[in-house]
Amino acid sequence: MTRRTIVIPSRLAWHEERFRAAQENALGLQILTPSQLAGRLAGGFLEAVSQDICHELVRNALADLKFAELEQLREMPGAVKAICATLVKVWDADMDLQALAGRTPRLSDLAQIESYVRDHLPGGMMLQRDLVSAAIANLKNAGSVLGPVTVTGFSFVAPCWRRLFLALAGSTSIEWHSIETLREQLTWTQPSSIGVVFKPKRTPTQTSVVCATPKHEVVEALRWARQLIVSGRARPHEIAIVASSTEDWDEDFRVLVADSQLPVHFVHGCSATSTFPGQQASSLATVMLEGLSHDRVVRALRLLHNIPKLKSLPGDWYTSLSPDAPLLKLRHWQISLDKLAEDPEKPDFRPVLLPILALLSQGAPAAEQVGEELLAGQARAIWLRALLDGPPQALTTSIGRLRVPDESDPNANIIWGPAHTVASAPRPFTRMLGLTSRHWPRQGREDALLPSHILDPALLEPAGVTMQDRIHFAMLRDAAGDIVYSRSRRDSEGRLLGTSPLLPSEVAAEHLQRSRIPQHAFSESDRLLARRQEFSETEGARSAISCYRDWRSLNLTAHDGLVNSGDPVIEAAITRTHSATSLRQMLTDPLGFVWCYALGWKPPSPLSLEEPLVLDKQTYGLLAHDLLRQTAAFLESNGGFAATTSMQIESALVEATRRIALEWELTMPLPPTRLWQRTLTEACNTAFSALTWPLPELKGQKTFVEVPFGGLEGGEDKCPWDRNAVVAVLGLDLKLRGKIDRLDLDSESINARVIDYKTGRCPDEEPGLKNGQELQRALYAVAVKALLPKVVTVDAALLYPGPEGNLFSLPDPKVQIEELICVLQLAVQLLRSGQSVFGPGAESRYNNLAFALPANADGVYFPQKAAARDAMVGNLRSFWGEN
């Protein structure tokens, strides 16, 4: 068996040579990169320092050493990566940093770091220059170890590796395979015995296209690839799509390739966060850096369900948590889990969750321990790599920049990647993206640590990025049989782009419209959009077209809320037990009532705002009501509310504020601490004003707060009635339930006073039913009379506390209740007839179901449908009043 060696520059070329060797049944063949070649020659299982080890040692050097100029870089994000990149350039250039150290303090600092790295390398590892020197010193056995050497795929050879190849040529035969395009780049081989074999240039079929945006370029590239495959002109492993740098197209490729199901291999790897292990690491980093929260912790631990520490947790453990609790601090989690542990029917989650949450709550300083204890396999590798690339405080950013190898086989797939890699294994069908003045060629930049005034760039980088882009362009062009040049008119932000100077002037460009109908679609969605007739016959298209037309019609249609009369789902929503809120929506927005109570639609969760700057009006009202309830209940049970003094009310209110603040921290999204304290003070003042409002005292008055009726849970423990008794609206089959803010009764339960506290802006005049928006007084009066037959008079009032507040008693309750019953009858008839149209409640700026309405409903939809709506609702329209 004859031993021979092939030296290649990239992993893509390694895959190709390995596949070719398998096809040829080759024996005794070694496929090596230059660093592997040096390690093989040096012997003793030596290898060049890896990227991860280099990052780790440079990070340690920054922590341990003292510097003249690099001291300020010690804690800066990206410092480790920048220093490693500079050191690699120095090593590639075959420069002796120790000899240059005396020139400037900057070079001295870098030489100090290099010495530290060299001294702390693990056994079996050497710096690149040292490894090459060791290999050259051990060339006597090169013929036996390597056999004949073939070098292929290189566009540029760094001086460090040139030294190795030139020395190796004296010990064994080297045959260098290249393309005629690179003849000038290989003049350094002429003094040696290296035999250079030039492959002649090909004359490719050249096409140039101009697209609208980078995303459009990706779409057209995938269409082109599918056309080549289905026409039989090319197979996937003969097709390459390249760019000088891939960042502007990567995300679009990832999404569109998944949609197209084309076999595409990402040469440069996939984004770590597009993989499951990357999501595990990223979600954990988010919790660690941004802090504990309900959403963040649940998401992270659900992704980590397979780690040993969480295997004892049931799969649905998170459903036991309160859905509205933000749980922003470790103490909140401890109290919440303590309450869950009191339920004997549920497992105790504390032994599993609390140690993990305590570790995560330590933040960035615990990053290494978090990765060690909570991650495994590739997720841990991603975590550790991100810690090497940057400080723990930037972990989420570092993870987002990482790439992991694509596990698909490039020998069976279309390849997408950077030109410098694809040029090492060019393909007959090539499409170049981004041929604009910005990308082909890219403009070179000075090294961040060794600019031109410190070290000549020609020494540090003999071939800059601009020269390399030109070389790679020529290599790909001259190696292809069919090549397409592609550029976009504008970038993703809309800026106009110039044409690359590398584009052949003799090739006329074809301008492609983004909305054009392609001959070959790259995916099913692309095909359907290209075939309008076929798309129009799909269920989704028919529904969309029908909705589009109906929303623009002056008549009311099914898309405006018209359904068959007697719909059982709507009937069930009507016959449910109602609150003042549901009846308000029934009267002011029948369509919203159906969405909310028949279909079960809900507005977005409040957890989407984990720490709002201010409480919204509804939440502030809940806070004030909680303060009123707890304070009044305490005072009533300690001598009676009617006999209390202002000092007693203030003292009880302070204690209630303390309890409620603790309770809300565990269950509600709250503003930052200082804003929350101010909100508590405002709510406390509002509650004090309400509790001290001068109201005439009833004889032998008893006060009840948060009084439930109709089967509603919670509220006052000592109700003056059966809390489960059915309350119905006379003349209707509507059942009521609710909670009265405050109920005062005299000793004989003959006279009653119902108070509904309001925390909004006080109106200038008596609001009445307010076009269906103020129903509480009338409904609560109905409930009190139904549940307490001895009651003769009910004073139902709205109380707006505060210096500019007022008390509004319901004028002529009998008339108001009769009017309410009448309009409720109209609303029920409208719903049962299938005419659930929008009302003034839908047009309100506070409509929390506005997301389900057409876009710009205020400007177009509501005015367009108003006339037809008004004609349909009849007398209900006069109750709504003027919008």
Language model features with spans:
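Conserved RecA-like helicase ATPase core segment
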Residues: 146, 159-211, 484
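Structured, non-catalytic alpha/beta "coupling" segments that mediate domain-domain communication
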Residues: 83-96, 173-177, 584-592
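Basic/charged alpha-beta structural segments of nucleotide/phosphate-handling enzymes
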Residues: 11-145, 154-159, 166, 181-182, ...
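Anion-coordinating catalytic cores for phosphoryl-, nucleotidyl-, and glycosidic chemistry
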Residues: 2-33, 42-47, 189-883
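Alpha-helical hinge/cap motifs
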Residues: 153-161, 421-424
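Short, hydrophobic beta-strand segments that form beta-sheet elements in well-ordered domains
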Residues: 4-10, 150-151, 174-178
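Flexible, charged surface loops at secondary-structure boundaries
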Residues: 1-3, 139-147, 168-170, 425, ...
